[in-house]
Every structure is written in C-alpha cells, then in structure tokens.
Regions:
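OB-fold and OB-like beta-barrel modules that bind single-stranded nucleic acids
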Residues: 9-13, 31, 67-78, 96-99
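Short histidine
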Residues: 29, 79-81, 124
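Core FKBP-type peptidyl-prolyl cis-trans isomerase
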Residues: 4-46, 90
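Residue-level recognition of specific faces of alpha-helices
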Residues: 4, 28-30, 50, 60, ...
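Beta-rich strand-turn-strand
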Residues: 54-89, 102
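Beta-strand/loop nucleic-acid-binding surfaces
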Residues: 47-55
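Short coil/turn motifs at secondary-structure junctions
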Residues: 14-16, 34-38, 56, 80-82, ...
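Acidic, gly/ser/pro-rich intrinsically disordered tails
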Residues: 1-2, 19-22, 42-44, 87, ...
Length: 131
C-alpha cells in the first residue's frame, strides 16, 4: 500500500504557528489547487485542501510563506475523527512531509503589489504597439 500526495497551489491565508501542550509546533493551512480542466463557463475551478504541518517544517512555513504563496507540497492523506455534540465527524487532510516555495520573495512582492492594479492600466493603445 502506498499513500502519497503531491500538490502545487497557493496558501489561502497567512499560516499561524501553534504550540501544543506537549510543546510541539503545528500549523494548519488551506491550499487552493486549480483543477486540470475548465468549467463549462470557461473558468478554472479550485479545490481547497487542508494541510497539517508539524515541527521545524511548520516553523519554516510560517517564517517564509504567506497568504498567496505558491508552494509545492509532498505528503500523505490522513483521516481523523472526533466527537462533537454526540456525532462522530471525519476530517480528511494532507499531512505535509516537505514543501518547496515556488516563487522568490521579489516575485511574491511584485504579485502582491499588482494584485489591485486595474486591468485598464495594462491595455495598450493601438499607437503604442511596437509592430
């Protein structure tokens, strides 16, 4: 049996480090992963995958990645259950074994600065075209 997950996506929120009562570091984040195909209206849809990152890896993720960071994740699927209000609930998440940042800090800063830019500013008039 083999349980391996490899994903590329963007963090949907700033990761926050939590320390458990046993002094272990952990962060739980969500990764937005585009589907390989477009919907009927021509738009890409995304799945939002829960990640759990432990220890030094969690500390590194919190230090170097932020909301919108493009990362590659290598891990495994885990299902856990918990009781709430007399009901058993199941949660499936990815336990992260490693990750890689796929954009530099400069690229991230440029993306964040351009996020609010109006597309009208990017349209060139016909006289401005070089050909």
């Amino acid at each position: 049996m083999y349980n391996k997950v490899i994903m590329i996506g963007r963090l949907t929120a700033q990761p926050e480090l939590v320390t458990t009562p046993t002094e272990k570091s952990v962060t739980r984040v969500t990764l937005a992963v585009n589907r390989r195909f477009k919907s009927q209206n021509g738009e890409r849809e995304a799945d939002f995958i829960s990640l759990v990152v432990w220890g030094r890896l969690a500390e590194t993720l919190v230090s170097y990645a932020g909301k919108g960071s493009l990362i590659s994740v290598d891990g495994e699927l885990r299902t856990r259950k918990y009781e709430k209000d007399g009901h058993t609930n199941y949660v499936t998440e990815v336990l992260c074994h490693s990750f890689q940042l796929l954009e530099s800090r400069a690229q991230r800063a440029m993306r964040e600065n351009n996020a609010g830019q109006d597309l009208a500013d990017l349209v060139l008039e016909e006289e401005e075209l070089p050909f």
